[in-house]
Regions:
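Auxiliary Fe-S-binding modules of radical SAM enzymes
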Residues: 131-132, 142-281
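Radical SAM/AdoMet-radical enzyme domain recognition
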Residues: 1-18, 25-140
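Glycine-centered flexibility sites
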Residues: 12, 20-21, 51, 76, ...
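Short, well-ordered turn and helix-capping elements at secondary-structure junctions
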Residues: 20, 86, 114, 199-202, ...
Length: 281
């Protein structure tokens, strides 16, 4: 992975995100972060965690200048519901991780997947956290990456519905975000933090997307909705040089679909059916 990232930075990539589940489950992960920090072409290293194993590493992360943002996945603020959604009985530990990160000098975002029948009644509880905490709460439209294929569209809470729910208790004002931002962001008067909504399923942000993804098994993805366009791991194992890698990346990026609907329609296996744990994120 270090080699892949080095090649990508030589092509102009300046920001990366390392994701889980929980990337800190790898015993060598902190050492890997330290290695990446010496890449002079890399400006920002961001991390997504489920909160299981990051807490003890927070002091080290605070000392790494290139660690910019930590995204904590937390879909409920209620212990029993959290257990039901995640199948992990670790809510007290994850909430303590949230508190530890919020007190640190790291920029913290909470990722909340809005799921019909599970946590839609907690949307404004999450928004309320931003009143006295300098965090960004980002609500994510539920995507079909559940290992079972997508549910009926009528069941999904989309961007508009989520925003309407927030407006029942708060007065969110749009914030101008950078062009490639995945979320539509809002401020609320008197709140230290902000709120964002990621239209991941309705895919209204595709036109500005500049992201690529490499899965845990080495598959290169131009879009979350494609089924993987090339296996980088096998390419490297077959002796590819760094120049070979550069040529490959340039070729693959040129084939990036205009939006997620096109990517999904091009899938060889039909509907999206992987889980996010197999994709990575």
């Amino acid at each position: 992975m270090y080699r892949i990232i080095r090649v990508l930075t030589e092509l102009g990539v300046t920001k990366i995100r390392l994701t889980g589940g929980e990337p800190f489950v790898r015993k060598d992960f902190v050492g890997f972060l330290e290695m990446l920090s010496f890449n002079d072409l890399l400006e920002a290293i961001n991390i997504t965690t489920n909160g299981a194993m990051i807490s003890k590493h927070i002091p080290v992360l605070e000392r790494m200048d290139k660690i910019k943002h930590i995204n904590l996945s937390i879909d409920s603020l209620q212990k029993e519901k959290f257990h039901q959604i995640t199948r992990r009985d670790v809510f007290p530990e994850v909430y303590k991780t949230f508190e530890d990160l919020e007190r640190s000098n790291l920029n913290l975002k909470l990722n909340v997947v809005v799921q019909q029948g599970f946590n839609t009644d907690e949307i404004n509880d999450f928004v309320a956290l931003t009143q006295d905490k300098n965090v960004t709460v980002r609500f994510i439209e539920e995507m079909p990456f559940n290992g079972k294929g997508q549910r009926d569209l009528k069941e999904n809470w989309n961007y508009t519905r989520i925003l309407e729910e927030i407006k029942t208790k708060f007065d969110p004002k749009p914030i101008i975000s950078e062009i490639s931002s995945t979320s539509k962001n809002f401020s609320i008067k008197g709140h230290k933090g902000t709120v964002g909504i990621i239209p991941a399923f309705t895919r209204t942000i595709c036109g500005d997307c500049n992201r690529i993804r490499i899965t845990p098994v080495g598959t290169f993805k131009n879009c979350l909705f494609d089924d993987g366009v090339f296996n980088i791991r096998d390419f490297l194992r077959n002796g590819a040089s760094n120049n070979d890698l550069k040529e490959l990346f340039l070729k693959l990026v040129k084939e990036k679909p205009a939006n997620g609907f096109i990517a999904e329609s091009n899938r060889k296996k039909g509907n999206v059916s992987e889980s996010m744990s197999t994709i990575g994120g």
